[in-house]
């Protein structure tokens, strides 16, 4: 008898593709690793993945994790098909749950209703009130995204979706911990929070390039994300610790 051991896989159905250009994002540059269009998961690949994942997973609760880039760029139809596939391939003793991480800017009433209907846990990336969030979390035009993210968050709240907030700790918000916490608790009504330190390691020779931040669609050269220096966006040990 085959003994199945629980395991986790983070699935990126759009690869590194994202509609934002957050200045500290370590993943945007991964777009250069793919041929044009090759980073999008096809529905055929999705079916093979779901079948193999559920076959390899034990009975009981099984969680599938969806991330990006920005996973909602793949479209609602893709995730509706995912639900059909999970129902087709799960064993009777399996309960399939889904967790998705999003920047929140593309979440509409329709998306929120879908997440609620299918029991998704949705993590939304927010770095605090508008001046702190917009310091680094910008769109392709370099403009702040806070208002768009909050609209998405409010749609999720109205639909009753289980949510949490993913907040990076960076040079812009590191000295405003109490303000950020109260904003999440009192204004957004968040119950679960995750804090992720931004530490952008870089070699001295690449520091000037790293300070500019990655921009999608540019011809910027890649650089190694290691070294003895850190960018000015990085949090300090004292502030984070």
Q: Locations of the language-model features?
A:
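Conserved alpha-helical substructure of the radical SAM core
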Residues: 1-102, 106-113, 118
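Hydrophobic faces of well-ordered beta-strands that scaffold small-molecule active sites
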Residues: 9, 62-64, 98-102, 122-124, ...
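Short, flexible, mixed-charge acidic loops at enzyme active sites
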Residues: 23-24, 127, 208-210
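Conserved radical SAM core fold
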Residues: 31-32, 71-73, 104-109, 121-143, ...
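Glycine-enriched alpha-helix->loop->beta-strand junction motifs that scaffold or abut catalytic
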Residues: 116-122, 188-189
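A conserved non-catalytic segment of reverse transcriptases
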Residues: 122-123, 150-153
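Radical SAM enzyme [4Fe-4S]-AdoMet core and its adjacent flexible, acidic
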Residues: 140-147, 154, 158-241
């Amino acid at each position: 008898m085959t003994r199945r051991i629980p395991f986790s896989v983070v699935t990126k159905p759009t690869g590194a593709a994202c509609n934002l250009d957050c200045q500290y994002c370590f993943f945007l540059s991964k777009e250069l690793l793919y041929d044009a269009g090759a980073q999008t998961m096809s529905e055929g690949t999705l079916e093979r993945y779901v079948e193999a994942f559920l076959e390899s997973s034990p009975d009981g609760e099984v969680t599938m994790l969806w991330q990006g880039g920005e996973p909602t760029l793949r479209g609602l139809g893709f995730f509706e098909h995912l639900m059909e596939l999970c129902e087709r391939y799960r064993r009777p003793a399996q309960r399939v749950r889904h967790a998705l991480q999003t920047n929140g800017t593309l979440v509409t009433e329709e998306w929120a209703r879908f997440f609620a209907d299918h029991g998704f846990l949705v993590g939304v990336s927010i770095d605090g009130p508008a001046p702190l969030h917009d310091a680094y979390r910008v769109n392709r035009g370099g403009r702040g995204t806070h208002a768009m993210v909050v609209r998405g968050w409010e749609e999720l709240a109205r639909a009753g979706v289980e949510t949490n907030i993913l907040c990076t700790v960076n040079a812009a918000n590191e000295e405003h911990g109490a303000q950020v916490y109260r904003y999440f608790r009192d204004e957004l009504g968040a119950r679960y929070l995750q804090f992720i330190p931004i530490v952008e390691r870089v070699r001295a020779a690449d520091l000037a390039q790293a300070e500019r931040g990655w921009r999608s669609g540019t011809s910027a050269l890649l650089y190694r994300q290691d070294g003895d220096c850190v960018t000015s966006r990085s949090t300090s040990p004292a502030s984070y610790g």
